[in-house]
């Protein structure tokens, strides 16, 4: 474990994680929570072991991305529910990368479910619980001073890199990466850095053999036991990462 890092004041509790300051101003203490939410947090249910599973999945993915040249905020996983991460100033954007039609894209454009795209589709959503995270385009991002055009361009570049690597990871697991959501922050030097988490909470995953959902849609649509599904994702991921 990083030497002498101590948990201090609670900074923020979100839908899936609680963030704490530490005795190092550059490091945050993240605790993954045993709960699932839907409808932008309006539905919240305790889920046994979910925090532990998501923490381990996210930790393995962040380490893999770093090993493949994609920098991110992950430092280490000192315990089952805790992650130490580099502190960044979060950019209030959710970046969604879509490889096939599903969810809101499918509904909005009446595209057949899981229609594959010739190239990835990138979308931005403005992070605001009050506004229900509305879609936002490049011009609107600039008009609202959310991020500069240069930062948006860098987010897009990194998002496509992440997509390329994640697609390969999940394919090796026998899983189709349909789409996913990621977030970025700025370091003290202004560098754009991948942050937040990558887990079945933020990805849409489909078993290539059975077509079964292996993500939070299991909770959203009451399709089965979320804990066992996330455990299956972790088991496959660990096998791939240890190969």
From Swiss-Prot:
Entry keyword set: ATP-binding, Ligase, Nucleotide-binding, Purine biosynthesis
GO molecular function, one term: phosphoribosylaminoimidazolesuccinocarboxamide synthase activity
Pathway entry: Purine metabolism; IMP biosynthesis via de novo pathway; 5-amino-1-(5-phospho-D-ribosyl)imidazole-4-carboxamide from 5-amino-1-(5-phospho-D-ribosyl)imidazole-4-carboxylate: step 1/2
Enzymatic reactions: 5-amino-1-(5-phospho-D-ribosyl)imidazole-4-carboxylate + L-aspartate + ATP = (2S)-2-[5-amino-1-(5-phospho-beta-D-ribosyl)imidazole-4-carboxamido]succinate + ADP + phosphate + 2 H(+)
GO terms, biological process: 'de novo' IMP biosynthetic process; cobalamin biosynthetic process
The EC number(s) this enzyme carries: 6.3.2.6
Disulfide links within the chain: none
InterPro entries: SAICAR_synt/ADE2_N (IPR028923), SAICAR_synt_PurC (IPR033934), SAICAR_synth (IPR001636), SAICAR_synthetase (IPR050089), SAICAR_synthetase_CS (IPR018236)
Enzyme class: ligase
Keyword Iron applies: no
A Pfam family the protein falls into: SAICAR_synt
PANTHER family tied to this protein: MULTIFUNCTIONAL PROTEIN ADE2, SI:DKEY-6E2.2
Family in the record: Belongs to the SAICAR synthetase family.
Protein name (record): Phosphoribosylaminoimidazole-succinocarboxamide synthase
């Amino acid at each position: 474990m990083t030497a002498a890092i101590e948990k201090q004041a609670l900074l923020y509790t979100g839908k899936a994680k609680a963030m704490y300051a530490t005795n190092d101003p550059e490091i945050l203490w993240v605790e993954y929570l045993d709960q699932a939410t839907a409808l932008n947090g309006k539905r919240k249910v305790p889920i046994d072991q979910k925090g532990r599973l998501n923490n381990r999945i996210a930790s393995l993915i962040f380490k893999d991305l770093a090993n493949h040249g994609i920098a991110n905020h992950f430092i280490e996983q000192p315990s089952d529910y805790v992650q130490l991460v580099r502190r960044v100033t979060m950019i209030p954007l959710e970046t969604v990368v879509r490889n096939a039609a599903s969810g809101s894209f499918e509904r909005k454009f009446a595209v057949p479910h899981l229609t594959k795209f010739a190239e990835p589709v990138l979308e931005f959503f403005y992070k605001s619980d009050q506004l229900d995270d509305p879609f936002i385009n490049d011009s609107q991002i600039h008009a609202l001073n959310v991020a500069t055009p240069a930062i948006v361009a860098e987010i897009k570049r990194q998002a496509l890199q992440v997509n390329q690597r994640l697609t390969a990871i999940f394919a090796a697991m026998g899983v189709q990466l349909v789409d996913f959501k990621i977030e970025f922050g700025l370091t003290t030097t202004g560098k754009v850095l991948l942050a937040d988490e990558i887990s079945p909470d933020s990805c849409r995953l489909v078993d290539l053999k059975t077509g079964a959902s292996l993500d939070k849609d299991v909770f959203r649509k009451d399709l089965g036991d979320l804990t066992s599904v996330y455990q299956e994702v972790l088991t496959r991921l660990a096998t791939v990462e240890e190969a």
